[in-house]
Regions:
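ABC family nucleotide-binding domain
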Residues: 1-210
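Conserved switch/coupling elements of ABC/ABC-like ATPase nucleotide-binding domains
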Residues: 212-217
Length: 217
């Protein structure tokens, strides 16, 4: 599904990634661990097409993402990649349901079944009863579940999560862990997660350890 070859990334004179070669297959659950500053989040952002590598190639489903123009890259990201971050970035003026539907609106993919799809995602995540609440009416764990539902609304090929439990208490973090495992095991969702959480890292079928811009799979 994803092949990284010779990936290097520098910001000015600072080299963050020093040559990454790795593959992610459909159905994988990959956890990326390592100390702060090792390049974990940078690598995830490159896979998502949020930033460009200084050297090397990234192929997504056989397509070289570095060769895509901005419109094609945005379309790929909206339709095939689900993104979850430590901070949910929900729009405060929209309800949970409306936040989940955002990728459909942005991609001009709204149709008669979109709301049903969104409600099904919220139900899977255990918060269908919160669909019409604003973000400030939800707990931190509920907000993160809405963010996960939003990432899943277009049925992406891969879910990329950057410290998805970093801002949650242990109970809510464990709930998110369980949801990610269910997505992977029951639905075959490909998951790649950057984490400092040992429990979440241990769930990965593959564990990548990053140190000083290098990866040990």
């Amino acid at each position: 599904m994803i092949a990284l070859k010779g990936i290097k990334k520098s910001y000015g004179t600072t080299q963050v990634l020093r040559g990454i070669d790795a593959t992610i297959a459909a159905g994988d659950f990959v956890s990326i661990v390592g100390p702060s500053g090792a390049g974990k989040s940078t690598l995830l952002h490159l896979i998502a097409g949020l930033d460009a590598a200084t050297e090397g190639t990234i192929h997504f489903a056989g397509q070289a993402i570095q060769d895509l123009d901005k419109a094609a890259l945005n379309q790929m990201r909206n339709e095939q990649i689900g993104l979850v971050f430590q901070f949910h970035n929900l729009l405060p003026e929209l309800t949970a349901l409306e936040n989940v539907l955002l990728p459909r609106w942005i991609g001009k993919k709204m149709d008669e079944v979109s709301e049903k799809d969104a409600l099904e995602k919220l139900a899977f995540l255990g918060i269908a009863d919160r669909a019409h609440h604003l973000p400030n009416e939800l707990s931190g764990g509920e907000q993160q579940r809405v963010a996960i539902a939003r990432a899943l609304i277009n049925n992406p090929s891969i879910l990329l999560a950057d410290e998805p439990t970093g801002n949650l208490d242990s109970a809510n973090a464990n709930a998110v862990h369980d949801l990610l495992v269910r997505l992977n095991e029951e639905f075959g969702q490909t998951v790649v997660v950057v984490t400092h959480n040992d429990q979440l890292a241990a769930l990965g079928k593959k564990q990548w350890v990053m140190t000083d811009g290098l990866l040990k799979a």
